[in-house]
Amino acid sequence: MARITVEDCMERVSNRFLLVQMAIKRVKQFREGYEPLVPSKNKEIVTALREIAAAKVVPEDELSAAAAENRAE
C-alpha cells in the first residue's frame, strides 16, 4: 500500500491544525469502536489520514454547509 503523507491530506484540508484535530478525533472514534471507512492494516493515525486523503472524512464546517444546502432544496 502506498505511503500516506501530510501533503496528500492537505489537498483536502487547507489548514494543518484542522488536519491534526480531524485525525485525532477520528483516532478517538476508532478507540470507541467506530469502524474504518477505508481498508487499512496500519496504525489508527495512519488509517485516519488515509480516510482524510480519500475524502471519507471531511471538516465539520463542510458537513454543516452541505446539510444547510440540502435543507434549502
Curated annotation (Swiss-Prot):
GO biological process: DNA-templated transcription
Swiss-Prot/TrEMBL catalytic activity: RNA(n) + a ribonucleoside 5'-triphosphate = RNA(n+1) + diphosphate
Record keywords: DNA-directed RNA polymerase, Nucleotidyltransferase, Transcription, Transferase
SUPFAM superfamilies assigned: RPB6/omega subunit-like
GO molecular function: DNA binding; DNA-directed RNA polymerase activity
InterPro entries: DNA-dir_RNA_pol_omega, Pol_omega/Rpo6/RPB6, RPB6/omega-like_sf
Gene3D superfamilies (UniProt xref): 3.90.940.10
SMART domains in UniProt: RNA_pol_Rpb6
Annotated TM spans: none
Entry GO terms, CC: DNA-directed RNA polymerase complex
EC number: 2.7.7.6
Protein origin, superkingdom: Bacteria
Keyword presence, Transferase: yes
Pfam family, one: RNA_pol_Rpb6
Family that this chain belongs to: Belongs to the RNA polymerase subunit omega family.
Function: Promotes RNA polymerase assembly. Latches the N- and C-terminal regions of the beta' subunit thereby facilitating its interaction with the beta and alpha subunits.
Assembly behavior: The RNAP catalytic core consists of 2 alpha, 1 beta, 1 beta' and 1 omega subunit. When a sigma factor is associated with the core the holoenzyme is formed, which can initiate transcription.
HAMAP family per record: RNApol_bact_RpoZ
Record-given protein name: DNA-directed RNA polymerase subunit omega
Protein source organism: Oleidesulfovibrio alaskensis (strain ATCC BAA-1058 / DSM 17464 / G20) (Desulfovibrio alaskensis)
Gene name of this polypeptide: rpoZ
